[in-house]
Design a protein with these regions (language model features):
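A short acidic, Gly/Pro-enriched loop at the edge of an enzyme's catalytic core
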Residues: 85, 150-162
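Conserved SAM-binding loop
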Residues: 126-127
Length: 187
């Protein structure tokens, strides 16, 4: 059972992370909780170079809306998830939409890619990018929702796959994140 002290501490962590990412969204610069630092170390000067090193293809990067790649990645979850056409994929901590837009192309018109982020500024950035994505792909299969990964705004047994890129580690209540993931995944 969590005490009021631990709940206050959890909220303080969320507020710190939310504030750091809000600043990044507003500055459109790379970094994690302070400019120039990602959750995996120093942020690169070239976000596309980092993405290529993580296995994103040149074609994937060129197809992204401007500003979606902020150099915050620590991996390539859409590739590792082996997403299939028709699947519903959920991205925890979707930020500017980088992995959601890539996942949306992989699941195609019969699938859906949903991004959840707790930072209104990141969601605004992602939502501004949706028009470009739809124009390029002719797909209407991506959406972004405001919420915390410990309390997902997603129905039970709704998604086929969950991806996340350097975000779960920032949660002060990881067991709750895993419970939420189990709740929203289809059996």
């Amino acid at each position: 059972m969590k005490t009021s002290f631990s709940l206050d501490k959890d909220q303080a962590v969320r507020d710190l992370v939310r504030g750091g990412y809000a600043k990044i969204a507003e500055e459109t610069s790379a970094g994690c909780c302070s400019p120039g630092v990602s959750c995996c170390g120093s942020a690169p000067q070239d976000a596309d170079k980092l993405a290529r090193e993580l296995g994103y293809t040149k074609e994937e990067l060129q197809a992204l809306p401007e500003g979606a790649n902020m150099g915050l990645s620590c991996g390539n979850p859409a590739a590792l998830a082996a997403l299939q056409p028709g699947e519903v994929v959920l991205d925890l901590g979707s930020g500017g939409g980088f992995d959601v837009f890539i996942a949306g192309r992989k699941v195609g018109g019969s699938g859906r890619a949903i991004g959840v982020d707790m930072t209104a500024e990141m969601l605004a950035k992602a939502r501004r990018n949706v028009a470009f994505y739809r124009e390029q792909t002719k797909l209407e299969n991506v959406e972004f929702r405001l919420g915390e990964i410990e309390h997902l705004p997603v129905a039970d047994n709704f998604v086929d796959a969950i991806i996340s890129n350097c975000v779960i580690n920032l949660s002060p209540d990881k067991p709750q994140v895993w419970r939420e993931m189990a709740r929203v995944l289809k059996p």
